[in-house]
Amino acid sequence: MPDHPDNEPILSYAPGSAERAELQAEMDRQMSEVVEIPCVINGEEIFTGNTMTQVIPHKHGHVLANVHLAGPQEMEAACQAAVEAQANWIEMGLEERCAIFEKAADLLSTTWRAKANASTMLNQSKTAFQAEIDAVCELVDFWRFNAYYARQFHDEFQPLHSPEGVINSTEIRPLEGFVLAITPFNFTSISGNLPSAPALVGCTAVWKPSRNSIFSNYVIMKLMMEAGLPPGVINFVPGSGEAITSIALENPHFAGVHFTGSTNTFNGLWERIASALGNLASYPRIVGETGGKDFVVAHPNCDHRALVIALLRGAFEFQGQKCSAASRAYIPRSVWESIKDELVEEVGRITMGDA
């Protein structure tokens, strides 16, 4: 078994650094063109002609891409492609599947690093640091750690014991059918992980990205294809509304949903899946992460300056648009009296827009 992976190192992007210069050049390149983003179904690019624009959130007049939206026909084709691809994908075996995503991690940490970071900065208005820890480091870690632990399914997680005269065996199989991955706008890493984690263990997926992060998500889709992902294993279907989602949820081969988003949306998915059970070949697995609240607890002997920085960054980095953002603080009265003026002053210096 390969050695336990290390976390991907975080680059600083300090002034004068090589990575900063490379990132700036890639941002300039991406801003100089308008990309046509297709659906990707069974490895083929489908330009539907039904388009929406993807703009820079902090500069609405700048168009990054024209997105060709999936309709009912494309969603049905994506579901069928996923079903038809599964047998060969299973036959490939875990080790070869792991190798594809480990190669994707290697590409993301090297030649695709600037591409992923630049697209996330432009598409989701993240800083270089926020993009680096998300689009690169976290997704690299997902792919490497997922592969590492997937290899341990048999030997480590469920060891077998066979008494004399008895032969016990375990066969770990993927779900029969496709997984619908519905991904969020705020983390490129989660968007890449939701379809690829089930794919690693032999499932196939239909990936419906958030309308607000299609540009960066398409970069990740292209990266996985360059790493050797076979056609049909993950099908990329940007679209809108409940109409195309319902087509997947009501497909007899729908086997599961992998979701990150709002609690209300997830509740709605449960209800719609329940109403479609009579049409499904099996009981689908429903896995979801919804909105959370984070907090800061300060010790009476804490470093006051460090606390102020933690409160500012925890609450306001990426505009607080993440479940790990701090929305509550528990601070001893003695500490609060000494930091409140500085904290209020620093909050007043925060500006909105392109820095």
Regions found by a protein language model. Name each.
Residues 1-25, 129-156, 169-172, 260-267, ...:
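C-terminal segments
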Residues 1-64:
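Hydrophobic face of amphipathic alpha-helices that form TPR/SEL1-like repeat modules
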Residues 49, 53-55, 61-154:
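Glycine-rich loop-to-alpha-helix module at the N-terminal edge of alpha/beta enzyme cores
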Residues 61, 97, 202, 234, ...:
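Residue-level signal for inorganic ion chemistry
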Residues 155-231:
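Conserved small-residue-rich beta-alpha loop and adjacent elements
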Residues 168-170, 235-258:
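A structured beta-alpha segment of the ubiquitous adenosine-cofactor-binding alpha/beta core
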Residues 197-199, 248, 278:
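Hydrophobic/aromatic ligand-binding patch that stacks against planar heteroaromatic rings
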Residues 223-228, 250-252, 256, 263-355:
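ALDH superfamily catalytic-core signature
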